[in-house]
Amino acid sequence: NKDDNYADMTQFMIGTANDYKFTSRDFKALLKVLNGEIPLVVEVSRATDILNILKFSESQQIDLVLWGAAEAHMVADEIAKADVPVILDPLDNVPRTFDSLNSTYENVIRLDQAGVKMAFYYSQGAGSHNAYLATQSAGNSVAMGLDYITAMKSITSNPADIFGLVGVGSLAPGFDADLVIWDDDPLELMTNVDNLLVDGIDQ
């Protein structure tokens, strides 16, 4: 339970436990999760595993974010009921492992229909490499039938909301003046950036 988790981490932090395989940085991050300061991001694919992690997060009373979630469409209603957001790549619709046998391009459509908040990323690269291709993922989701505004939110305001970032992700009074001006539809593959402003400063 949560009290035991606190006790274990406290024991580690004061140096009385030697059998942990985590660093102090790991435990500090976990403390923030348990305190509700940040969400726990879990990479998961199979529908059964998604249901299990939903039950776990509810029992521990922690905020959860699902990452990847190839079979989320199979349990979309349960995810929506738990009010858990999903970060996924709409283009990642081909089974790559046995954990994602039920991958489908309809994943984002079914999640949206269930009312699940989504954020998109581009999965074909390490870390943030090729992150700019998230617009391509969003554009493809629109081609698959997702509402345009929903797709735009999935690469702008939704990521900010999911991680509790204040003042970014939207254009509103008091928000950071971060703005990209495109020469056409930003979700079209051949569109280019005309101008970029960060904190209102032309880059």
What are these regions (language model features)?
Residues N1-L64, N192, V198:
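Polyanionic/metal-chelating signatures
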Residues D26, R46-D49, A72, T104, ...:
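Amphipathic coiled-coil/heptad-repeat helices and related helical stalk/stem segments
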Residues V41-S45, D63-E71, L91-R96:
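Catalytic beta/alpha-barrel core
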Residues T48, V94, L187-E188:
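Glycine-rich nucleotide phosphate-binding loop and flanking beta-alpha elements
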Residues P173-Q203:
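C-terminal cap of metal-dependent C-N hydrolases
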